[in-house]
C-alpha cells in the first residue's frame, strides 16, 4: 500500500486528481490540504505518508516553501510537484527546494501512478516539457541570473544522457533499456 497526501487549493483540480488515483487500489489517500502550511501540519500528525503530491501556487504557504520545510524535517517523505506551471523559475526553485519529481496536472492517470511508484523507488520523474526546460536550464546555467556557483550542478555525461531521454518523454524503464542500465 502507498500512503499519499495531496496539497491542492483548487477543488476541481483536487477532485480530478482524486478521481485519477482512485483507479489504483494500492493507493490510500490519507490527507488533503488546501495550502503548504496544512500539508506540513498533516505530516506532523501522521508519520505514515510515503508521498505528497504538491501544487505550487497556494494561499498561506506555497508548495515550494512547504517542500523545502518538509524535506528538512521529513526527508523520507517523497514530494511530487504536480502543477500547471512549467516556467523556469518554478522548475528551478522546486528542484532546489527538494522536489523529487515534477509533473503537470494534465498528466494521465497511469503516468501519475508510474510517477508515484518510480519516485518511491528512488527515481525522479519529469513531464517531457519540464525535462526539456530543466536540460536547457543546466546547459545555460552560467547565463541565468538566479544561479550562484554552488547552485550549478555538474552532471556527468551519463546524467545528461538520462535527462535528454526524459526530455523525449521516455519512461524510466525505457531509459534503462535504451542506455543499458540495470
Give, region by region, the residue ranges found by the protein language model.
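Regulatory hinge/linker segments at domain boundaries
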Residues: 136-165
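Active-site beta3 strand of CheY-like receiver
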Residues: 47-53
Amino acid at each position: 500500500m502507498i500512503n499519499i497526501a495531496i496539497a491542492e487549493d483548487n477543488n476541481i483540480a483536487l477532485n480530478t486528481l482524486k478521481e485519477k488515483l482512485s483507479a489504483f487500489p494500492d493507493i490510500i489517500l490519507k490527507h488533503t490540504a488546501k495550502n503548504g502550511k496544512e500539508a506540513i501540519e498533516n505530516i506532523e500528525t501522521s508519520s505514515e505518508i510515503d508521498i505528497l503530491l504538491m501544487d505550487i501556487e497556494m494561499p498561506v504557504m506555497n508548495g515550494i516553501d512547504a517542500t523545502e520545510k518538509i524535506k528538512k524535517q521529513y526527508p523520507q517523505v517523497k514530494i511530487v510537484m504536480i502543477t500547471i506551471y512549467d516556467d523556469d523559475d518554478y522548475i528551478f526553485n522546486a528542484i532546489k527546494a527538494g522536489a523529487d519529481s515534477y509533473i503537470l496536472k494534465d498528466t494521465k492517470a497511469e503516468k501519475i501512478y508510474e510517477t508515484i511508484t518510480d519516485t518511491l523507488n528512488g527515481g525522479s520523474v519529469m513531464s517531457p516539457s519540464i525535462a526539456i526546460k530543466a536540460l536547457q536550464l543546466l546547459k545555460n546555467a552560467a547565463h541565468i541570473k538566479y544561479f550562484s556557483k554552488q547552485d550549478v550542478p555538474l552532471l556527468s555525461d551519463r546524467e545528461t544522457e538520462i535527462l535528454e531521454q526524459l526530455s523525449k518523454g521516455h519512461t524510466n524503464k525505457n531509459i534503462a533499456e535504451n542506455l543499458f542500465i540495470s
